[in-house]
């Protein structure tokens, strides 16, 4: 039975499988099951995994703690992709173990950019000049009889 891919995003099954794989990857990386000097010297977080509609490809978004040495960490994960796939397959009960892809997680950068925009002088000026909800002439609920 084919799963429907909705234009609004991934299916519930894709999300559930992605979360299982995220937990499995995080556990493998936390325990240090992969013997690699780069991975051994960094704490790697896995904030998100996205699954393809057929559940055969998992894209893991990773970030070393502190955000430094991203390229070597991703290269090390790519080198050990086969072992990581085997470990994920051992921990997650699926018909097929998905191929793994590793990408840099950019959500922290995006959050910092949005925070910087919100703190900008222009936005602060707009917020100060905007009318407040309680100033719009609506009666206060405490003054009702």
Curated annotation (Swiss-Prot):
Residues 122-145 are annotated as: Disordered. One of its GO terms (cellular component) is cytosol. GO terms for molecular function: ribosomal small subunit binding. Residues 122-132 have a biased composition (Basic and acidic residues). Pfam families: RBFA (PF02033). Keywords: Cytoplasm, Ribosome biogenesis. GO terms for biological process: maturation of SSU-rRNA. InterPro entries: KH_dom-like_a/b, RbfA, RbfA_dom_sf, Ribosome-bd_factorA_CS. The keyword Cytoplasm applies. It is found in: Cytoplasm. Belongs to the RbfA family. One of several proteins that assist in the late maturation steps of the functional core of the 30S ribosomal subunit. Associates with free 30S ribosomal subunits (but not with 30S subunits that are part of 70S ribosomes or polysomes). Required for efficient processing of 16S rRNA. May interact with the 5'-terminal helix region of 16S rRNA. NCBIfam families: PRK00521.2-5, rbfA. Monomer. Binds 30S ribosomal subunits, but not 50S ribosomal subunits or 70S ribosomes. HAMAP family: RbfA (MF_00003). This is Ribosome-binding factor A. It comes from Methylorubrum extorquens (strain PA1) (Methylobacterium extorquens).
